[in-house]
Amino acid sequence: MTSIPNNLAKNAAMGLAPQPRAKVRDPRLDFFRGVGMFIILIAHIPENLWAEWIPARFGFSDAADLFVFCSGMASAIAFGGVFAARGWLMGAARVIHRTWQVYWAHIGSFVVVVSLAIAADRWTGTQFYTSERMGLDPFFADVQGNFVRLATLTYIPDWFDILPMYLLLLAMIPVVMALAAVNRWLVAAFILTLWVLANVFGVNLVADPATGRLWYFNPLGWALIFFTGFGFMRGWIPAPPVDKRLIVAALAVVVALMPPSCQLMFSCDAGGWGASLGLDSGYRTLAEWNSKTNYGPLRYLHFLATAYLAWIAVGEGGRLLSGPFTELMRRVGQQTLAVFLAGLFMSQACGMLLDWLGRGVVTTTAVNLFGMAVLIAVAFIVSWFKSAPWRERKPAAATQALAASQRTPSSARRAARIG
């Protein structure tokens, strides 16, 4: 009897072959991932004046949506081809390998950033950074127990909640590919079921057993945007047409959702324009529809509209993405895990610098640019290491000759030796 994994492998090889466009890395993907890395840095620097002007201040969706959507697209490139060429088991093994890397990245980043906060407290003679800034008092109240829970992902610290969500989304890929081998509509049913569980029934995971705090990024809800990106890059979801009516509709959505977002100039805080215009009641009414934790429908709509406009703006195939700035963004976007981890550290380090230097215009600008420069340096350094410069490079002619000999049939090579 043929085993289920073998059937899945055959189905994957025969029916899940990626579209041609999924085989080539899309320059738009790297560009927008790079942009997202800088926005995430700026957004996470405590009390950062620059954070008042990031895209999240003008609508419901933000850089987290961009990060997860692009991660879904990148996962389709990195893993989808393995499922198609090598079968389900090898594809699942490839996903497990990446999940293992991200798991240790999560654990390591927490240890390093907390060490930075402890060092800052010792230097200043306070408990400000561990207690007030990072809210680690519950963690230190039961260090031994919480370290065990940290390792088992049953304790998710504040500031460190996106990688655990990403881990579970990665773990869903083998399930999604198995369903797609049967029928792609099963994938849609699976993802929508998870989304309904999160948004309608409030199903979520516990981030802190001591307080009952839930995961800030509920993977059941965020699977929708992740696998939307995954589906686009696999060719399961067709690219939208360039249509003036769609452009107008997307613009209308983006503009219409700016006031209800109650951010920046429409702030619903006391004295803000939003409060005087009565937008605060509308904001509270739409809160569940805009849920960041469960990925509410208005958030999804806003991101799709924004993404469509950005897709149109860069031109077909990203042809308008040229020049040194674009290349810099792409280089950063090609090393997102390393850059993201550096951003977690630098956001806290930059916040400390602003605490000590002040938050004037000049110092804020200098500190933000310093943090961005570090991310760029990390991207280039990691890229250099990945190129394995210590390996001996074979001359091009020798490489071509070797490749030609490997393509020559063994019988022809034997005949050549005899002759």
List each language-model region with its residue ranges.
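Alpha-helical transmembrane segments and their immediate juxtamembrane cytosolic regions
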Residues: 2-419
